[in-house]
């Protein structure tokens, strides 16, 4: 491994989007810049596992075994297999921040040594706590996602998880924060906008949107929405889903203000 530090740094320099978020990438680069030591890829402390060829007293280190599963599950070493050709190199590896070093340093070095293509991007996510406490079975505070979905809805639960925590950060879960986020962003904002538009359309326009000239107010609204859509696309590409959804919330707020002004003026859209 010690011989691959410069090659890794060169790869990182040429592929600045390889690890997201950037703060995690900086940690990876800093670690490699300090100099890599050789990594033992076998263990003798237990006898279960894949035996090392030529020395059956050793078994392959479980992390080396685990990483190669990305390839062997696709048919490797048959690099002409349909699965391998369809799915490798992977577009994304989505991993916890605690195993980033294995995926962003050891794994690329192994692939380089084997003359195999590297995954396109590694996304490192944070951890969840529950009301500032670590999740554990002994404490009885493990969140069952099926229970959350059953009680609050699948889309609502997904929205909360994606919106509540900035990409790459650790997040803290509580029922109160889930309810607050869903009520505020989905029911009171998005739901209110949908209800207001349909109600005004049915009441004043017989449920049909007529042809009409675009006024300066509509032009401003369209420009605002276009800007936020552009922001959304940038954030989404960078896997900053929370910020992307914040852009959607900004669009909803602008539309709510527009419909409110329209109602005050003439109850027409």
Predicted regions and their residues:
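Acidic, turn-prone loop/beta-hairpin segments
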Residues: 205-233, 260
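Core structural elements
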Residues: 246-257
């Amino acid at each position: 491994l010690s011989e691959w530090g410069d090659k890794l740094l060169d790869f990182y320099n040429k592929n600045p989007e390889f690890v997201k978020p950037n703060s995690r990438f900086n940690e990876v680069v800093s670690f490699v810049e300090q100099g890599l030591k050789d990594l033992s890829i076998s263990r003798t402390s237990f006898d279960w596992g894949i035996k090392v060829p030529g020395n059956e007293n050793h078994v392959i280190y479980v992390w080396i075994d685990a990483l190669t599963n990305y390839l062997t599950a696709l048919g490797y070493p048959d690099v002409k297999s349909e699965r391998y050709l369809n799915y490798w190199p992977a577009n994304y590896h989505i991993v916890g921040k605690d195993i980033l070093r294995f995926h962003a340093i050891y794994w690329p070095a192994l692939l380089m040594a084997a003359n195999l293509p590297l995954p396109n991007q590694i996304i490192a996510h944070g951890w969840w706590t529950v009301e500032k406490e670590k999740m554990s079975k002994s404490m009885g505070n493990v969140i069952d996602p099926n229970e959350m979905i059953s009680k609050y809805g699948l889309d609502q639960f997904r929205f909360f998880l994606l919106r509540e925590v900035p990409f790459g950060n650790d997040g803290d879960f509580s029922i109160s924060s889930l309810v607050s986020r869903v009520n505020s962003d989905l029911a009171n904002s998005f739901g209110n906008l949908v209800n207001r538009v349909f109600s005004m359309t049915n009441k004043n326009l017989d449920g049909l949107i007529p042809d009409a000239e675009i006024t300066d107010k509509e032009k401003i609204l369209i420009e605002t929405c276009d800007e936020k859509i552009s922001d959304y696309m940038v954030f989404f590409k960078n896997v900053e889903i929370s910020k992307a959804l914040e852009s959607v919330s900004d669009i909803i707020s602008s539309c709510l203000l527009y419909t409110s002004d329209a109602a005050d003026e003439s109850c027409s859209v």
